[in-house]
Curated annotation (Swiss-Prot):
Keyword Coiled coil assigned: yes
Domain observations: Consists of three main regions, an N-terminal coiled-coil domain that binds to protein Pup and functions as a docking station, an interdomain involved in ARC hexamerization, and a C-terminal ATPase domain of the AAA type.
NCBIfam families named among the record's database cross-references: pup_AAA (TIGR03689)
Family: Belongs to the AAA ATPase family.
Protein name: Proteasome-associated ATPase
GO biological process terms, semicolon-separated: modification-dependent protein catabolic process; proteasomal protein catabolic process
The keyword tRNA-binding belongs to this UniProt entry's keyword annotation: no
Binding site for ATP: 237-242
Length: 560
């Protein structure tokens, strides 16, 4: 018994051993758990990577249409397929031409955007609301579908669109600078009241343009058709372009008055009441055959589109002789033989040209093809003359106004009345410009018959010259103020500006062909064979003269 009692350890010692063993096992278990967790995470990560690299390739397609059974028609690799759609894809919100993603089972699993690149085609004709006839490379024509974001947009004939050739979808409108730069589509803010010295011409234009638009019922009652176009011709700088802009502004106001009288026109929000298509004539010419004619067709297609909404449209051809000169008169080319017929076909061809007014401006109307000038095309021909003394006063009053700073000495001379002072300035300036004194002699011309005539500066005056004179006077006043003088414009500033303007124009008539120069300047009649310029000092003393005869001048070649 005593021996057994000796072999036993105390209970507290055995418990401590068991506790140490349990703690050791727990620590090992934790380390094993952590290792297993890390291994499991690595396995999961490796499995994900393996799945990622072994995933079958996905493909993209273009959505075409949805069906009631939850399937969709798509174009994939040039083939049209009907595929299932995953529940996560909002089928009702997909639009034609939109990209969709397909999985390996050829199921639509995601929606994308629209193709941002592609070939460029030009719209030739719109077919319904979702199709168009376009022209591509080598003038190949095809019918295409408008992608979802183009449906309902203002797609026009002549617009450039990107296309995906295999599906036939067009996605995006691309700005074409070569077309947009040729036509300036704007609503001018020039009124007839802003034009001076052309009251008779303005009255003739209003009778020709505004009456048919304001009273179409009376014209129909009398069997009278409104004019299709008008020609403004005359010397440079006399207001032809300004009149054309005023016509567009006046038509806009006329349309607004007509709507107020009970004939409302349904226009899009923000749409203008008139459009002014300013065609840059020389830039319209293109070295490629048929391009100029195509641009003319696009211009009139745009005009018809605007006019179809009941909006008056003015198509303005400045420097008209550069585009539509008489057929057969070309020296180095014969482009006019096809350009002129294209314009004639647009003005009075099979397609009607309602609410569109064609206005041409030229200072060489003798070079324009007669077929364009005949009645039925450019019906009204209005000559814009050089201003006489009364017209010059009217033009001066548009630029030299009482609101400008006037010099105190000049104000004191006329009772401190700004309006009276300005009127006196204008009278002095007009008297200086239109004087037939020797200091105003400009040219001596000799006609083919041997007759001679002295021309004065007043014979070459224009509205642009008057505006330039007023601007010079303002500059003189500013320079005097900066030099330490008093503020304001003086009569002396205006008279000095007149003399400076005359001096700058003395050498301009020295051309190799005086007769052509005279025609452009508005001097028509017998052929001029000799020009002698009369050069003046500021005091009016003749200091010399320069003569030039047609027969004695070596004319350069046609390409120089």
């Amino acid at each position: 018994m005593s021996q057994q009692h000796d072999d036993r350890r105390p209970p507290d010692t055995a418990d401590r051993d068991l506790a140490r063993q349990a703690t050791s096992l727990a620590e090992k278990n934790e380390r094993l758990t952590a290792a297993l967790t890390a291994a499991r995470a690595q396995l999961v990560e490796m499995k994900a990577q393996l799945e990622e690299v072994s995933k079958p390739p996905g493909s993209y397609a273009y959505f075409a249409a949805a069906h009631a059974d939850g399937t969709a028609d798509v174009y994939s690799a040039g083939r049209k397929l009907r595929l299932g759609v995953a529940p996560s894809v909002p089928l009702a919100s997909l639009r034609p031409g939109q990209e969709v993603q397909l999985n390996e089972a050829m199921t639509v699993v995601a929606a994308g955007g629209y193709e941002p690149v592609g070939e460029v085609v030009t719209v030739k004709e719109l077919i319904g609301s979702d199709r168009a006839l376009v022209v591509g490379r080598a003038d190949e024509e095809r019918v295409v579908r408008l992608a979802g974001r183009l449906i309902g947009e203002n797609v026009r004939v002549g617009d450039a669109l990107t296309i995906e050739p295999r599906t036939g979808f067009v996605f995006e409108r691309i700005p074409r600078s070569e077309v947009e730069d040729l036509v300036l589509e704007e609503v001018p803010d020039v009124a007839y009241a802003d034009i001076g010295g052309l009251s008779s011409q303005i009255e003739a234009i209003r009778d020709a343009v505004e009456l048919p638009f304001l009273h179409p019922d009376l014209f129909r009652e009398h069997g009278l058709k409104p004019p299709k176009g008008l020609l403004l011709y005359g010397p440079p700088g006399c207001g032809k372009t300004l009149i054309a802009k005023a016509v567009a502004t006046s038509l806009a106001h006329t349309a607004a008055r007509r709507d107020a009288d009970g004939e409302p026109a349904e226009l899009p929000d923000g749409a203008a009441r008139s459009y002014f298509l300013n065609v840059k004539g020389p830039e319209l010419l293109n070295k490629f055959v048929g391009e100029t004619e195509r641009h003319i067709r696009l211009i009139f297609a745009r005009a018809r589109e605007r006019a179809s909404q009941g909006i008056p449209v003015v198509v303005f051809f400045d420097e008209m002789e550069s585009l539509f000169r008489t057929r057969g008169t070309g020296v180095s080319s014969d482009v006019e033989t096809t350009i002129v017929p294209q314009l004639l076909a647009e003005i009075d061809g099979v397609e009607r040209l309602d609410n569109v007014i064609v206005i041409g401006a030229s200072n060489r109307e003798d070079m324009i093809d007669p077929a364009i000038l005949r009645p039925g095309r450019l019906d009204v021909k209005i000559k814009v003359e050089r201003p006489d003394a009364e017209a010059a006063r009217d033009i001066f009053s548009k630029y030299l106004v009482a609101d400008l700073p006037i010099h105190p000495d000049d104000l004191a001379e006329y009772g401190n009345d700004a309006a009276t002072t300005v009127a006196a300035m204008i009278d002095r300036a007009v008297g200086r410009m239109y004087s037939t004194a020797p200091e105003n002699e400009f040219l001596e011309v000799t006609y083919a018959s041997g007759d001679k005539e002295v021309l004065y500066f007043k014979d070459f005056n224009s509205g642009a010259m008057i505006q330039n004179i007023v601007d010079r006077a303002k500059k003189h006043a500013i320079k005097d103020l900066l030099a330490g003088g008093r503020r304001g414009i003086r009569v002396d500033h205006v008279l000095e500006a007149c003399v400076t303007e005359f001096k700058e124009n003395e050498d301009l008539p020295n051309t190799t062909n005086p007769d052509d120069w005279a025609r452009i300047s508005g001097k028509k009649g017998e052929r001029i064979v000799f020009i002698r310029t009369i050069v003046q000092k500021k005091s009016g003393e003749t200091v010399g003269s320069v003569a030039r005869a047609v027969e004695n001048v070596a004319t350069p070649g046609q390409y120089l």
